[in-house]
């Protein structure tokens, strides 16, 4: 299971020199990670039981900053980055498959934790009511888009931190980012803790 690419990659291997490898890899990412996450997120929201509250005093002291949504969205640029830069040559394509297998397994393990120990985020109350109601520019992004798409569940452990850190590490391995850029990208994972 861990020492060679899974069978599902055979089709991808056959098209490894074609541009569509990128899009097909994104499709696998959606089916293997995004879709299960969304289903579990909405299921836990419907159940409505939280095992514990992961919020700390520090979390409660951080004020709402509307533009931080842009930082949050930057996480979603990481996912296609590994699929995009993992097409350079046959060795890197194999590494990309192994990387995504690792990412899938870790994600699935965390999704099991989300089911067994669901955690609700209670800090949304810090967001002004008009923003939560969908009013204004930030209201659209928070109230209408994010909060209806991603319910305040699945807070612990943080998939954002695990996934973004792994992606940065594989990009470093492939020397997509190095030196000061590597430090910058690694620091970009810090805001995903929020």
Predicted regions span which residues?
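Membrane-interface loops
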Residues: 40-53, 90-182
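N-terminal transmembrane-helix/juxtamembrane module of multi-pass inner/ER membrane proteins
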Residues: 1-81
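Internal transmembrane alpha-helix with an interfacial aromatic "cap," most often the third helix
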Residues: 76-94
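Hydrophobic alpha-helical transmembrane segments
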Residues: 85, 172-173, 188
């Amino acid at each position: 299971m861990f020492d060679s690419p899974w069978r599902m990659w055979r089709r991808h291997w056959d098209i490894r020199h074609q541009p569509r490898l990128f899009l097909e890899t994104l499709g696998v990412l959606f089916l293997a990670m995004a879709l299960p996450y969304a289903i579990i997120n909405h299921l836990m929201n419907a159940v409505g039981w939280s095992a514990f509250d992961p919020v700390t005093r520090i979390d409660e002291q951080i004020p709402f900053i509307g533009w931080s949504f842009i930082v949050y969205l930057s996480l979603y640029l990481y996912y296609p980055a590994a699929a995009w830069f993992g097409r350079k040559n046959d060795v890197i394509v194999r590494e990309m498959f192994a990387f995504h297998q690792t990412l899938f397994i870790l994600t699935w393990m965390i999704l099991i934790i989300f089911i067994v120990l669901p955690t609700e985020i209670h800090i949304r109350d810090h967001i002004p009511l008009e923003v939560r109601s969908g009013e204004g520019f930030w209201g659209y992004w928070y109230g209408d888009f994010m909060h209806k798409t991603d319910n305040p569940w699945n807070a612990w452990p943080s998939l954002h931190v695990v996934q973004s850190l792994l992606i940065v590490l594989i990009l470093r391995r492939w020397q997509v980012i190095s030196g000061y850029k590597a430090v910058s990208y690694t620091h970009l994972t810090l805001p995903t803790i929020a």
